[in-house]
Amino acid sequence: SGVYIYSYAFDNQQAADEASMVINCLSGHNPRLPVYYDLEDNSIIANGRQTGIASRAQVFCNRISAAGYEPGIYANLNWFNNILTDSVFKSSSWDHWIAQYNSQCDYTGNYSFWQYKSNGKIPGINGNVDMNYAYVDVSLYHWQLIDSTWYYAASNGKAYTGWLFQSGTWYWLEP
């Protein structure tokens, strides 16, 4: 499981408040997938606010990471190519989930998930559902016991190293 939040933050304080709300909701839970922050609302970039979008994303994602969860950014292809252009969106360790309703994803950066349609059908669910491809093994987002040693896999499938905060406990994971 993972988390998705649609942001309405106009400033850094509101981004921090959104992060706190997510962290409070996650208390006692350990999602395997990242906490995806959707910054696509036009109101948050209106009236010159676009210049602060990278700062708001950093505030949110840093708080999510400090609480022991993996942050990610969700947006459609147009936003990644034309709005989320600050280097923090390209060079950060934040996971990317791209929405592009097409037969292929044309995003040239790294991404783990591609939302390819919004009108999918699932038996037992009334109405349309979003359909996604995962380019990572989602089963890797958890603790693994390998040869009597515990590892925690990050979104890229590699063993996490350094300090990790999970379910209210800090762990030191050797490199």
Regions found by a protein language model. Name each.
Residues Q14-I23, F80-K90:
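Distinct, well-ordered alpha-helical segments
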Residues S139-P175:
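Extracellular adhesion/carbohydrate-binding repeat motifs centered on closely spaced tryptophans
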Residues I64-N82:
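Aromatic-lined carbohydrate-recognition surfaces of secreted/lumenal glycan-active proteins
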Residues S1-E70:
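Substrate-binding cleft of extracellular glycoside hydrolase catalytic domains
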Residues Y6-F10, E40-N42, N76-N78, Y101-S103, ...:
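Active-site beta-loop-alpha junctions enriched in small/polar residues
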Residues Q13, N47, I83, T108, ...:
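Short acidic, gly/pro-rich beta-turn/loop elements at beta-sheet edges
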Residues S87-S139:
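Functionally critical loop-and-helix segments that line ligand-binding/catalytic clefts
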